[in-house]
Design a protein with these regions (language model features):
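Glycine-rich FAD pyrophosphate-binding loop
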Residues: 2-27
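Solvent-exposed, polar/charged alpha-helical surfaces in well-ordered, non-transmembrane soluble domains
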Residues: 3, 47-51, 149
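Short coil/loop linkers at secondary-structure junctions
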Residues: 7, 57-59, 155-159
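Short, solvent-exposed loop/turn segments at secondary-structure junctions
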Residues: 16-17, 87-88, 169-171
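Glycine-centered flexibility sites
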Residues: 19-20, 35, 174
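Short, solvent-exposed loop/turn and secondary-structure capping segments
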Residues: 21-24, 50, 92-93, 180-181
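Dinucleotide-binding Rossmann-like beta1-alpha1 core, especially the glycine-rich loop
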Residues: 30-118
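Active-site/ligand-binding neighborhood in enzyme catalytic cores
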Residues: 117, 123-203
Length: 203
């Protein structure tokens, strides 16, 4: 806000200390997170985020390219899931799932790609629209139904996929697929790197 020239504002915090799910604490004298929220490396549409990271000293230009402070980067595998009595890399259940589940993963990947090709998704989303460029009709249709309803309409009823999509909604939006719009659910993937079914090539 300050960089945008806004000087009069009030920041409200629900808790006694600021930070939300990015707040940290101390355990046995060692700093640790109490929650976790990570930023994907910002793309060209997220200029305000880029500026903030630069102001915080988390990125700088080296030989004409942006370089991020390695101390603050998370490297793969970033997340793991305990399923079927064992750990697997990533949160999408793949270990021990059947062919029908994998087929639904591939179908969802195609649906996300179709929506991405129909109209652009970006992060932050507000960079997409203005009075001359309103939300695309295909996006408005998605925004009019819940992600759960859209998923059901598409025949995506596999319990592993349903769990994963609901988790993604709760993680990013604080509400499950029955409360989040289909546009928001698809935006979770389309504004990043899409959705890639296991075993499928990544462009």
């Amino acid at each position: 806000l300050r960089l945008a020239g806004v000087s009069e504002f009030v920041l409200l915090e629900l808790e006694d200390t600021p930070g939300g799910n990015s707040r940290g604490g101390m355990v046995g004298g060692l700093p640790c997170p109490q929650g976790a929220h990570y930023l994907p490396l910002p793309g060209d549409d997220a200029r305000e985020v880029q500026d903030l990271l630069e102001e915080l000293g988390l990125r700088r230009r080296v030989s004409g390219r942006w370089q991020y402070d390695e101390q603050f980067l998370c490297h793969s595998p970033q997340e793991r899931l305990f399923i079927g009595g064992a750990w697997q890399d990533g949160l999408l259940p793949v270990q021990g799932v059947g062919d029908a589940t994998l087929a639904q993963y591939r179908r969802f990947a195609r649906l996300v790609a179709t929506q991405t090709n129909a109209a652009r998704f970006a992060m932050p989303a507000l960079t997409l629209w203005d009075a001359q460029h309103p939300m695309a009709p295909s996006h408005r249709a998605l925004d009019a139904v819940t992600f759960a309803a859209w998923r059901a309409e598409q025949g995506l009823d596999d319990p592993h996929l349903r769990w994963y999509l609901d988790y993604c909604c709760r993680d990013d939006y604080g509400a499950g697929a029955h409360r989040v719009s289909a546009w928001a659910g698809i935006h979770y993937f389309a504004s990043r790197h899409g959705f890639h079914a296991p075993g499928e090539p990544i462009d």
